[in-house]
């Protein structure tokens, strides 16, 4: 199941995994906290800043909200077009929702362009990301080409509603990312625990050697009558 879920990951998950692996779990010796710059500022490049933005969970949540909002716009427009919400509605109302949907799609187009610029070939390594981009581009083209058609949603309403699948992909991507982060931290904690156990065993050995040395020195002192035996 985990192998299937990994196909739903978004671009940038590999970058986040590397970042998590670089986190040090310091228990033996603590260091003074350092003032580290924000990842967006520390990227030192526009492409790096875009990678951080597209990989952040807050951005994924914004995308989920926009996808749901866009689907609601489309659903309302379909219902208005089929005259299910009201028998008579102003002709301008469906157009308003249509343009609202186009505005959200325009943001998705910019998102795809930004991902292509930031991740380049890595973008095409995620099949569902490519499929998602194809759905958005096709929906955007259809909306623009048939912008004056009143019966557009009778034919392509379901196609546009397919964008709802992005919610499942993004949510699954977040789940897989959190799971991977937890597994990596557990692995590092286990390694750190083994290291600490080795240090404890080494310290116990040193203590035993010191106790033996103390006994030897006490015996030597007693032999030279430095102090009487207890």
Curated annotation (Swiss-Prot):
All ranges on the Extracellular side of the membrane: 80-96, 149-155
Highest taxon of the lineage: Eukaryota
GO MF annotation list: voltage-gated proton channel activity
Cytoplasmic-side positions: 1-58, 120-127, 177-230
Coiled coil: 177-226
Gene Ontology CC entries for this record: monoatomic ion channel complex; plasma membrane
One Pfam family, short name: Ion_trans
Membrane-spanning ranges: 59-79, 97-119, 128-148, 156-176
Keywords on record: Cell membrane, Coiled coil, Ion channel, Ion transport, Membrane, Transmembrane, Transmembrane helix, Transport, Voltage-gated channel
UniProt topology in membrane: Multi-pass membrane protein
Predominant location: membrane
Subunit annotation: Homodimer.
Similarity comment: Belongs to the hydrogen channel family.
Domain description: The segment S4 is probably the voltage-sensor and is characterized by a series of positively charged amino acids at every third position. Unlike other voltage-gated ion channels it lacks the pore domain.
Purpose of the protein: Mediates the voltage-dependent proton permeability of excitable membranes. Forms a proton-selective channel through which protons may pass in accordance with their electrochemical gradient.
Protein name according to UniProt: Voltage-gated hydrogen channel 1
Annotated organism of origin: Xenopus tropicalis (Western clawed frog)
Name of the encoding gene: hvcn1
């Amino acid at each position: 199941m985990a192998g299937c879920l990994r196909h739903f990951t978004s671009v940038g998950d590999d970058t986040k995994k590397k970042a998590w692996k670089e986190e040090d779990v310091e228990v033996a010796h603590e260091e003074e906290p350092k003032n580290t710059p924000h990842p967006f500022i520390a990227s030192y490049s526009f492409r790096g800043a875009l990678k951080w933005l597209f990989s952040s969970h807050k951005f994924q949540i914004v995308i989920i909200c926009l996808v749901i909002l866009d689907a609601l716009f489309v659903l309302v427009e379909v219902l208005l077009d089929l005259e299910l919400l009201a028998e008579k509605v102003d002709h301008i109302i469906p157009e308003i929702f249509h343009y609202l949907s186009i505005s959200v799609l325009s943001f998705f187009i910019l998102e795809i362009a930004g991902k292509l610029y930031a991740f380049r070939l890595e973008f095409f390594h995620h099949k569902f990301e490519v499929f998602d981009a194809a759905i958005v581009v096709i929906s955007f083209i259809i909306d623009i080409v048939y912008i004056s058609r009143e019966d557009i949603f009778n034919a392509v309403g379901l196609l546009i509603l397919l964008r709802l699948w992005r919610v499942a992909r993004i949510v699954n991507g977040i789940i897989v990312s959190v799971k991977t982060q937890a597994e990596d931290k557990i692995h590092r904690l286990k390694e750190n625990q083994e290291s600490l156990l080795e240090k404890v065993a080494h310290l116990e050995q040193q203590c035993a050697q010191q106790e033996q040395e103390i006994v030897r020195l006490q015996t030597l002192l007693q032999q030279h009558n430095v102090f009487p035996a207890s």
